[in-house]
């Protein structure tokens, strides 16, 4: 296992130009059929942006032009879904929607035309998200447990429970990152980055990287007293601001990166092994150049969905082309959110 160490005493105010190569903007088309209210998830393919907005899935091309929506598929018909809790992309390009109320997986093509339905047993609940692993396996995610479901056997074949603090959301959908045939897991409130192994109907989380912020700042859930109510732990956070509360971690062939809260500020730790960069940055409220927890990461690019009002605080125009700078002038406050694409060094 690799250990990545960061020195918090050397943390500096956010400076995007030190780790971002370029910034581009995608203005999502705003019309009566594509109006976004509260973006909950983003997925990026080679040709599409797929946005989940309050249970509705909408697709846009790479220019931001609106293509299709599942709005008309919300209902009680045989090919409709009642509650779109989560969605995932299948290898052939179809989109699978998890209806938590009816315990169904419904598959649609890229134009959101109905393909198939799979009925799930109710014992998979409670669930906060899910992930496609293979034609036979789906992974259902709850706040501190994982459930491996076999389609061919129509049942849960294994479970993994993180024996931490029950009030903490250790697992969340954004923490699962697919790279080729491998799946990696970034848990919250922990410094480890895992590879998810599925072998002979068994789940295993294998730690491959540890993020180290120093003995005084590292948070170890094993040290927490058990059996306390949620208020106890919230008060602990308030009383111990100089602990690192990890939100998301990202590891690729060149970089180790982590978003976390420390000393009542949001931080970003960045290491580029090829370039020899190892630095920690923090955001200052109401100042320009802030770097927020991303909605999606792929191939060295962070994607963040920003409301137009906040865009000015999240970009450095010196890293943008003239075309993208001019796009800012076209945006109105009541337009759809903007996807900011941060290409990393």
Residue ranges of each PLM-predicted region?
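A short helix->beta-strand "capping" segment at the edge of beta-propeller domains
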Residues: 8-36
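Blade-loop segments of beta-propeller domains
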Residues: 29-34, 38, 65-92
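Blade-level signature of beta-propeller repeat domains, shared across WD40, Kelch, NHL, RCC1
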Residues: 300-345
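Short coil/turn segments at the loop-to-beta-strand junctions that recur within blades
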Residues: 32-33, 71-79, 120-127, 162-167, ...
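Asp-box/WD-like beta-propeller blade repeats and closely related beta-sheet repeat scaffolds
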Residues: 82, 99-145, 158-168
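Conserved blade-ending motifs and adjacent loop-strand segments that build the rim/top face
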Residues: 208-233, 242, 273-299
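Short beta-strand elements that form the blades of beta-propeller/WD-repeat-like
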Residues: 5, 47-53, 93-99, 132, ...
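Repeated scaffold domains used in trafficking and secretory/extracellular systems
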Residues: 37-41, 80-86, 124-133, 167-175, ...
């Amino acid at each position: 296992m690799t250990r990545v160490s960061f020195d918090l005493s050397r943390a500096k105010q956010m400076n995007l130009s030190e780790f971002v190569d370029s910034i581009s903007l995608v203005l999502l088309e705003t019309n009566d059929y594509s109006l976004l209210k509260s973006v909950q998830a983003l997925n990026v393919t080679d040709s599409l942006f797929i946005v989940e907005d309050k249970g509705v899935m909408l697709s846009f091309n790479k220019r931001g032009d609106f293509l299709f929506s599942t709005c008309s598929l919300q209902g009680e018909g045989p090919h409709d879904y009642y509650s779109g809790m989560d969605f995932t992309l299948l290898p052939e390009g179809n989109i699978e929607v998890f209806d938590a109320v009816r315990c169904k997986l419904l598959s649609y093509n890229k134009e959101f035309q109905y393909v198939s339905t799979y009925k799930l047993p109710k014992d998979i609940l409670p669930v906060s998200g899910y992930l496609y692993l293979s034609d036979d396996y789906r992974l259902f995610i709850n706040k501190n447990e994982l459930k491996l479901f076999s389609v061919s056997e129509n049942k849960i074949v294994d479970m993994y429970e993180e024996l931490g603090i029950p009030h903490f959301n250790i697992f969340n959908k954004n923490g699962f990152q697919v790279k080729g045939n491998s799946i990696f897991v970034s848990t919250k409130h922990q410094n480890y980055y895992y590879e998810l192994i599925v072998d002979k109907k068994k789940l295993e989380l294998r730690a491959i990287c540890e993020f180290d912020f120093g003995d005084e700042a590292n948070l170890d859930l094993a040290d927490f007293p058990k059996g306390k109510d949620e208020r106890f732990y919230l008060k602990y956070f308030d009383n111990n601001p100089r602990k690192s509360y990890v939100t998301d971690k990202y590891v690729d062939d060149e970089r180790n990166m982590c978003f976390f809260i420390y000393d009542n500020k949001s931080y970003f730790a960045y290491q580029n092994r090829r370039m020899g960069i190892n630095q920690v940055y923090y955001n200052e409220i109401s100042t320009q150049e802030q770097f927020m927890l991303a909605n999606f990461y792929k191939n060295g690019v962070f994607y963040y969905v920003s409301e137009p009002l906040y865009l000015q605080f999240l970009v450095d125009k010196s890293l943008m082309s003239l075309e993208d700078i001019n796009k800012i002038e076209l945006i109105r406050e009541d337009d759809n959110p903007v996807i900011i694409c941060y290409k990393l060094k």
